[in-house]
């Protein structure tokens, strides 16, 4: 029974005794009527001879009465007829007792509740305990309208069925009956008044739902019944209950919410039951609980959040249970706890922070447990108990006390270490407990060496001799002597009988399923038997596989070294923890450091990313998950790197708690191989998934109608986009296109080229593109106009119409020249150029081989890539060709086995630019213009007729040729005669039809738009010995497929007039770039070095100054 309840009961008994004595005093002051002495009061209040009168109490108990004594005095207010043999009460015998209030009929032979007649209405207390009453009938009680206390204990009542009548009852005692069942609603009529209900010592095995609808009830006792399970909401309706006692019921299970509704309950006693666990489920709703008594149960576990709903708890009794460990969450939330009793358990493990939250704790009882290591090895096990006053560690098998064992107990006043065979205490182990008033210590096992010298003096200084009974066990000379009887000089260190750790176990990592060992060694000078133990996470390993060895440290020595090996086989994740060896003998125990074991497992995929094909604009979802130990980290890569287009555009999402990788609004550039990598300390694995994006066909360039003159080449564009790349098909006038030898297709049918167009070619051309996602169609209208008649004078400036006719001529001449003479011309030029510059060129190398095989017009954005140049291996493999890009990609001329040059269908795309009047910046008459390293058309002489090159080529250029990048200069010289120039050209073995073309071209040099110019002869060299070489395709100055023109920078303020004589002009040719037509302007006025005249040959300079229009600026073109 708790102290508060005892105090309350004692106070009640004291008040009752005072009242009785007061009434007795008043009775005695008026005379002793029961003794027959004369008195006025006694004469008025006669007392039966068989009874005793004490105030208003008539005590007729223990008289073995079979019937009531008559007559009963009318003044009686309290009548005690207990312990008699009454079996029947006449109502008439009490009818005159108008003052009667209390009747006690305990321990009689009544079988029913007696009828007391008219006085029943005045009775407030009726005690019928210890009778033979078998049932409670409402009609027997309905007359007791003033009844407040009814005691029916120790009767034969077995059922509570018929509801109680509506009485003013406050206290109802039904203890020690035979009640086995209760009818719900049995006490409902007492709901407004009943305060205390006791049903102890019955045979109740279950409490029906809604049994207690007693909102005023404050105390309910159900001790010593047979209640095994308590269901949820069992006590609903007892909102005012202050205490509930269910001791000795054999309760094994408390369901969640078992005490819900008892929000005002302060005391819960569940002692002597069979509970095994404390959980927050059955404590739910006990918000005001202050005392919880759970002693004498079988509790072995406290759940981490058990105290969530009862944080006002001030006293907790867990004595005599089966607790073996106190975790850091065992008492979490009990900041108001004042007293904690955990004595007589099996506690052998206390976490470092087990008591950290008990900031208000004043009494901690841990007696009779097994927590020796807490004091011996742990540092600050009681830290956080700032207000602790009383600590009981009696009977815990403590053998040694370290210096920091009681760290944090600054306010401790009472420390009980009795019944512990303590062998050693480190110096100043109690020094920080400044307020200590009592230290209880009794041991006869002390190792009285130099380390114990401080203890007797400290005990004497603090006047603890009356509480300390300590004697020595070693050395043999001091055995059995009290420490207070040993002089300070008697505490010496001649040996070390207590084991000392010499080899500490080491921290290790292991792969799951492998075997490993921990090794620990200690030395001792004693021959006392050694015991070895291993702990994991401060808990003893009972079934550990150990190997123990002993050997002398040195020959002839007296020091023994002991080694223990802990073997762990097929380690699992549960094997992880901190391992510690404990080596002990009769003189104490030594604890090693704690070695940590980490168990790793290689990652393995539980979810592997799968190849995904998805439409553009949709959301891509890639899953990847892996398991391992430690948990692996998941990382993603795209195409072997971390450059995600979706990440740059913030379209990529990776959920940290999820296994999914998202890309929203998928685009073509998201196509690639995505790699998922799972990595931990044991290793890494990866898995790949290919993302394919599908896009419906679309036109990357608008379809433009074309108008050409009869005989010209017509180029129709249909630049297609989509994924997978769409297939193209051309139709004419909604009918299949009849393909003739004049029809050519290029770039995957994206270009339709019609050579020598005829009026019959005019019409509506439909481009149909299709892939797996759909089909798209577009129309292009081709108009062919008849050949106009134009008589333009030779010496007049050409108009835009003249230039159109010139374009037609260029196309015709380009085709003829390419088929007949191009191969021979370039072979001759390249061969002699290489021989001329072989000595001054830089060393060739074959190590540079840049790819030039990606057509830029196929980019997914639908725009052309930047100009790309590169080198490709020549056919012979000994040299490289310099290759410049055109709008349609990189092009090389194709030769058949006879050396004949064929038209490259891909390069026909540039024909369009050549035939577009607004894309040709070079107007006026032209002449042959050659410079080594410059860029020219596919036919060396097309420029003569057109003023611009449809498909430029690099002339006489070796790879990395110095002359390509060096400064070219122009020198004044005497004008050679027409014959000398003609003779210079005639030295070359031209085909007859080419020679005719050259002669015709040369005759134009007399026009007003031409000036003779002499160049360094090294710039051009013709030889009759051809050498097989490849000629690289280069970029045009004109844009293709809408690409920006690569025009030279023009001088907006260039002069209209040019000097008639040749002024020195210099310009630079940069690698992989077009010639800068005005670059020489920056070098005007500087000196040049003249070459000898014999090194000069004849060339021409084109001027456009006489034909400047508002749309085209005039400038000089040096080539």
Swiss-Prot record:
Positions of the UniProt region annotated as Disordered: 1073-1093
Residue span, LRRNT domain: 38-74
Disulfide bond sites: 520-581, 624-676, 718-767
Record-annotated Ig-like C2-type domain positions: 499-598, 603-692, 697-783
Membrane-related topology note: Single-pass type I membrane protein
Residues carrying sugar: 122, 156, 274, 442, 469, 515, 688, 729, 905, 987, 999, 1016
LRR repeats: 75-96, 99-120, 122-142, 146-167, 168-189, 193-214, 216-237, 240-261, 264-285, 288-309, 312-333, 336-357, 360-382, 387-408, 411-432
Subcellular location: Cell membrane; Cytoplasmic vesicle membrane
Organ and tissue specificity: Widely expressed.
Gene3D superfamilies membership: Immunoglobulins (2.60.40.10), Ribonuclease Inhibitor (3.80.10.10)
SMART domains: IG, IGc2, LRR_SD22, LRR_TYP, LRRCT
GO terms under biological process: otolith morphogenesis
UniProt keywords, alphabetically: Cell membrane, Cytoplasmic vesicle, Developmental protein, Disulfide bond, Glycoprotein, Immunoglobulin domain, Leucine-rich repeat, Membrane, Repeat, Signal, Transmembrane, Transmembrane helix
Membrane-spanning segments: 810-830
Pfam families linked to this entry: I-set, Ig_3, LRR_1, LRR_8
Major localisation: membrane
Known role: May play a role in craniofacial and inner ear morphogenesis during embryonic development. May act within the otic vesicle epithelium to control formation of the lateral semicircular canal in the inner ear, possibly by restricting the expression of NTN1.
Protein name: Leucine-rich repeats and immunoglobulin-like domains protein 3
Organism: Homo sapiens
Lineage of source species: Eukaryota, Metazoa, Chordata, Craniata, Vertebrata
